[in-house]
Design a protein with these regions (language model features):
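PLP-dependent aminotransferase-like
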Residues: 89, 93-169, 173-185, 189-194, ...
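Conserved core segment of the aminotransferase class I/II
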Residues: 8-9, 220-250
Length: 250
């Protein structure tokens, strides 16, 4: 579907148009800012004895995430890949399914699909947003997929296409509203990979709150970091209960 491949110079120009420049200094991928307050709070957490998946600080963090993103539920997990893996499993992605993912993303997006026993089905990215291209996706699905009994199937492989995972590259929102329309047309579950986009909005709506659920990452190269860590956002209370069960006991 892609008519041409951008050169290295063209690709760098696209990145700079999205990220901006700071004089002649390189733009760092990440610069963690860890100070005295962080040291004090980590020490308090260690002293409490609750240093894993539950405890005062986990609950406070989840509540803060939910409030900041205007989500009903935020469930903390070990990292962003685990967040996406649990999210996909919880919405019904099964072994042998295909899951639509963007061609431009960190490998964890596709890895989470593979962890479910499903097959990543790559879709063109938009050179302006660097996210999955919803118009290209609609064109591709109309030509290469069909609905049978309410489920979308790849006409070439015969496999069910059960979900689509848009990713907000470098925190820049992709055309999520247009993608939601495409997903409705083809009866696809939307699970957002919002690993890089905490603090990013479309209008007044935070990224990661458009789909059925979403994954966040707090790795050292993200907007906020816990060293490692991730979370899942959802407004579906039943789904949140299932996700929390899987995240804490499975």
């Amino acid at each position: 579907m892609t008519t041409s491949n951008p050169s290295k110079q063209e690709f760098l120009a696209i990145l700079k148009s999205v990220l901006g420049e700071s004089g002649s200094s390189p733009i760092a991928l990440h610069e963690p800012n860890i100070g005295q307050r962080e040291n004090e709070l980590v020490s308090k957490c260690l002293a409490s004895g609750w240093v894993s998946s539950v405890g005062e600080y986990i609950s406070e963090f989840e509540q803060g995430l939910a409030k900041f993103t205007n989500s009903k539920h935020a469930i903390a997990v070990v990292n962003g890949t685990a967040a996406l893996h649990v999210a996909l499993h919880s919405v019904g992605v099964k072994p042998g399914d295909e899951v639509l993912v963007p061609t431009l993303s960190f490998v964890a997006t596709a890895n989470a699909v593979s962890h479910c026993g499903a097959i990543p089905h790559f879709v063109d990215s938009d050179p302006e947003t660097l996210g999955l291209d919803p118009l290209a996706l609609r064109e591709h699905l109309r030509a290469n997929a069909s609905l049978r009994d309410g489920e979308l199937h790849n006409t070439s492989t015969g496999r069910r296409i059960s979900a689509v995972v848009p990713m907000h590259t470098f925190g820049h929102p992709m055309q999520i509203e247009a993608l939601i329309d495409v997903a409705k047309e083809f009866n696809l579950v939307v699970v957002e990979d919002a690993a890089e986009s905490i603090g990013s909005y479309v209008g007044t709506t935070h990224t990661g709150t458009f789909g059925r659920c979403s994954s966040l990452s707090f790795n050292g190269n993200k907007t906020i970091t816990t060293g490692g860590g991730g979370a899942i956002l959802t407004n579906d209370s039943g789904l949140a209960q299932r996700i929390r069960h899987l995240a804490t006991t499975a």
